[in-house]
Amino acid sequence: MCIRDRDKTIDRPALAKLVFGDQEKLSRLNAITHPNVKKEIFRRIQRIKEKGEASFIAVEAALLLEEGYQNDFDTMWYVYVDEATRIERLKEGRGYTEEKCHEIMAKQLPEEVFRKECSTVIDNHLGISETENQIKTAVESLLSLY
């Protein structure tokens, strides 16, 4: 199976099809990619700090808890949405089947772990304006600490 498009970029749906059904392949992919992702995240953070460009830095990436980022960051946030909404969004946004959605979600940490490890929970099922309000409140709270 080829996982490159004609322009030699990664064909993300093909890669997902290849690894999400095989835990060993997924683990190998994560072992290859995530150390490099982590290096790049911290390289960018260092550059931003050196330039004094921000009051705070937000990082959004897959597997933050699984890769131990909670030991590196001041705070962790969890953006929550119920399972039915997640499935609906994955089907609409990425064209996944319901089976594919369940397969992916079964490999993720349970919600309880995120709620335990993260200091802030953003409820993302109430619509974009309510989500924005929650984020604004959380950012203001964070900035008041520093």
Regions found by a protein language model. Give the residues of each.
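Phosphate-binding/switch loop-helix module in NTP-utilizing enzymes
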Residues: 24-53
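Small-molecule kinase domains that catalyze NTP-dependent phosphoryl transfer to phosphate-bearing small molecules
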Residues: 40-41, 70-72, 92, 96-143
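Glycine/small-residue-rich loop that forms an oxyanion/phosphate-binding "nest" at active or ligand-binding sites
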Residues: 21
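A general structural signal for well-ordered alpha-helical segments in protein cores
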Residues: 12-16, 26, 38, 58, ...
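Residue-level signature of catalytic and energy-coupling elements of molecular machines
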Residues: 29, 58, 122
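ATP-dependent NMP and nucleoside kinases share a basic, alpha-helical "lid"
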Residues: 42-50, 56-93
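Short, small-residue-biased leader/transition segments that mark boundaries at the very start
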Residues: 1-3
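Amphipathic alpha-helical segments that mediate coupling or scaffolding at interfaces
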Residues: 18, 32, 44, 89-90, ...
